[in-house]
Amino acid sequence: MTPSALDRFPLPLRLLAYRSFHRFGAPRLLPANLTLSVTYTCPSRCATCDIWQKKVPDFTLDEYRKTFESMRGVPVWVTVSGGDQFVRSDLPELFALIREILRPKIVNLPMNGLLTKQIEKQLPGIVEATRGSKLIVNVSLDEIGERHDAIRGARGNWEKALGTIRLARELQKTNPHLTIGIHTVISRHNVERFPEIQRELRALRPDSYITEVAEERVELGTVGKRITPTAEQYAGAVKDLVSAARNRRSRHPMGRLVESFRLEYYDLCREILERGEQVIPCYAGWASAQISPDGHVWGCCVRAESVGNLRENGYDMAKVWFSPEADRFRKSVAARECACPLANASYTNMLLSPRSLTRVARNYLW
């Protein structure tokens, strides 16, 4: 099935259509925010993630090509996540398919910076393949020096991550579409030291500095691990973070835009942790989706509930996305049977919330 004309409408019109889809069930649209989890394999042994324990047959390039053809030109924002994506040797080709077929405005690559040889070999090709889109490379740093290595369960990760940042900066000199960010997961393992951590990481002068809260996710195998900081702990960390962000705003246009969304996200996340319920409507299952390494389609990675497998449905995203299983997932989310501060989905939710979007615009301008 090919995407409908409405799926390719300009984003402002599609946002209105998603609101109608959420409230009335029509018009039915494919997701604008797509996350591709391309492997569970990972050399890290993070205190906040057990995804490496999962073993599945990863999608091939040909399977991605078939899937992308079923949603050609639809996603606005594509995130390529893992595991550690760089265990794959075909990333430049995958990103070329994303650019050629999906043609998103933004491509996001979160990475731990650990596999130096593979990164040096593949990152230049990824940057080249994404010309025409904005590429955001977010290097994950949760602590400083050996403390970071301890949280990530990988000796030497700190120094290797800094090397990845240096490589990205060299590539940025001739590739203005590349934005370099640093990303921190705030957990019970680092929340008390977070004010010091964020000061030192900001001193590295990334285009943007972002954080998200550690969550108990089905995808990550962390349900029951008690890694999420308390609402009080997070509020204290966010207070310092927001103050630092406002006093030292990014001069990079894309970096400033990301920071503006993040400033709103920090407030939203704090409210969700305090109230334990959705603060603004969630559009996971309507406007945002994730595809697992073996082709399962999820509305979100926190619940990681498969609404169908692409391998079993002819690699047709619409067939899975508009299935009875997907409708049941959407009904559950609309009934507010879940609530979480998942950062990726929250971006989309904020775009679809007049309250949040107004605050984001204010953050960008002031």
Outline where the language-model segments fall.
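Radical SAM enzyme [4Fe-4S]-AdoMet core and its adjacent flexible, acidic
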Residues: 1, 132, 136-288, 292-294, ...
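Alpha-helical membrane-targeting segments
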Residues: 1-31, 249-274, 346-366
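Conserved alpha-helical substructure of the radical SAM core
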Residues: 2-134, 217, 229
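Short, intrinsically disordered, charge-biased short linear motifs at domain edges
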Residues: 27-37, 265-271, 285, 321-331
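Cys/His/Pro-rich metal-binding microdomains
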Residues: 43, 47-50, 283, 338-341
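Secreted/processed peptides and extracellular or luminal domains of membrane proteins
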Residues: 48, 52-55, 288, 306-307, ...
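Flexible mid-to-C-terminal extensions adjoining Fe-S/redox cofactors in radical SAM and related proteins
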Residues: 279, 294-366
